[in-house]
Amino acid sequence: MDAHGTPQPEPSYGEQFTHSAIQGVRAEGKVRIRYTELPGQFADGSHYSLRQPHYRFTDLGYGPMQPGTLVSPRIAPQMPGVGLVDAIPEADILANVQQQASRSDGIHGMVNRVFDPFAGKDVVGRFGWKANTASLAHQSAAAFHGDIGITSEKFPREDCTPKQKDCAAAPRGGEKGGPEIDNATLEKVIQYQATLAVPARRNYDNVDVRRGQALFAQAQCAVCHRPSYTTGASPFPSLRGQKITPYTDLLLHDMGKGLADGRPDGLANGQQWRTPPLWGIGLIPDVNDHSFLLHDGRARNTLEAILWHGGEADAARQQVLKMPKTDRDALVKFVNSL
């Protein structure tokens, strides 16, 4: 860990494992995934099955990994509304902590505090599966660097480890040794992301959707998936003072051993995850041609994602397990309408 609580890069493979590479550079290797089916049963006697992922690295291009390397798989987060999330006042996020601190049911979220290179200080994290980036600018520049190896003013070093000499010798895209994406271009990308609209709700007057909304509140899902906020300051005038319904508290919660990755990140421990916004979740199959959810995509649909909840959310999960199928279907219809 560094001084900000960030895990240190693996010596040979860095912070992020990459299975592909440009011409003339060796790929880091391959990742093999297999799943174990975990059967379960609802109170009404109907059955379900969850899939537990197992990962194996093969064809390593730069030698074995260091023993004890912490690995945490990720799927890409959803993009709609990120500019609005960026504009939620920090005071509102901290208020969520205070409101939950007085609860007696074990739901006690906390913020992650991370170093924001754009602010030059530690601030409340709000993006990433463990709330490990602080702003949309931070998230964007970090993704350019970590996901596709593009340097910027705040992330100027090439993402090559000492063993990756072919990576270090590859051509650079920046002019005169400067960053590969300049500030003006990065700002345009940030503006594009910030103004991605949230899709309109569907079927909100449907009787099952409305009943599902009541069940959502009854199961205490809305404690962590806080429905609404009013946005505050933003570089983009159209995003200021907006009533929004992202359904998140942006806090870290212990989700139990079933979802644990064992990898700390800032103040987040190996069992804690940020509550993801739910808006647009029902359109993921239309946009991405799949319905994989949670940090590593193990859940194949909304109901499976709910059934993976543990830890602070286990009481909510138990309520869903007790629901008859008609109620479970209504709950899922509501979530997918957001």
State each model region's role.
Residues 1-338:
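Periplasmic c-type cytochrome electron-transfer domains
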